[in-house]
Each structure stands twice: as C-alpha cells, then as structure tokens.
Amino acid sequence: MTFETGFPQASAARQSDKAGGPAPFRFAPTFKIDLTFSLAYVVLFVWTWAYGGHRLWHCAVAALFGFLLVLCYAGKVAIIGFLDRRGGDARTYVISSGLVTTGLYAFSRNPTYLLTLVQCVVWSALIVFLQLVGPLEPIVLALALLLPLAFFLLHDWVIIKREDAALSAAHPEAFAAYSKSVGRWFGRKRGARSL
C-alpha cells in the first residue's frame, strides 16, 4: 500500500495469492460510502412512504422507480465483475496489473461511480415524487435534493483524485493517455484517439 494513495498495488496485493494464502479481505471505503448513501435513501423512503398516501398510481410509479434502482444495483455488480475479470478488485482497491480501458471504461473512467450517481438521482426523484403526492416534509425533501450533490462532490473532489493518483502511479504512461481521452465521469474527449 502506498502512503500517498492508500491503495494496494497489484503486485503487492497479489503476493499473498502467490504464497498460497488469500489476501486479507477488506471493504473499500467507497463501498462503505455507497452503502451509507443507500441506507440514507432507504430511511428517507420508509419515512416518506409511512406517512404518505398509497393510491394505486402512487404504488405503480414507486414500483417503476424501484425497477430502475434494481437495474442500477445490478449494473454496478456487472461493472465490478467486468473489472474483476481483468485483474482488479473495486471492492478492495486492488489495482489490476494492466489498465482497464475497454467496455464501459472506454466511455467513463469511473462507470461504477457514474451509475451510483444515477442511482442517487433515481432515489431522489422517488423521494421527491412521494413528497409531492403526500405530506411534505421539508427536511426529507432537502436531503433528497442534496444527497446526489454530496455524493458527486465527495467522489469528484476526494475519492476519484486518490484513485487517479494510484492508477497514475501503477500505470504512468497508460493512465496519462487514458485520462486524456476518457472523461472522469463520462464521455470520450474531443480529438482523442482510441486506446
């Protein structure tokens, strides 16, 4: 693990695998952050649902939001599986021996965080909808509106900067080229050549 980044490098993290024993498992701080945001949304949802009306169309709209949330969570599992098959482990911050730039990573350097941001927006839209059709709770409404912004700022200003530093240290030339051609959150940059 490097002091500057706090992330284990692929070779050091995989040494225990070569010695025959598994590497000690730990959850990445970003997993804990994602879980915290999800739990906050569940609390807001339960609070809003408990005090709101339950007309059939309200339930149908809430079910649609629920379906979108299931797609978001399933998408994150698929992205983590994609990264895992290429030698990295997003759950424990094991950096792959080769920089992953294919699949969704060709369009976003952080597709899991992007999908989690979409998930936050869907959760917030559900809470706002329930607030509009039920009794208004200003604190719940304010939290629903602020949580996606808090997630974005925390990841953009803190988490992703640390991860970029770790990836740059592990793959200096490849990451420099990759970050010039693919946006931090989304999109290929203009004039960028394929990796």
Region locations from a protein language model:
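Membrane-anchoring alpha-helices and their flanking helix-loop junctions
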Residues: 1-105, 114-195
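Histidine-centered phosphotransfer motif of kinases
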Residues: 110-111
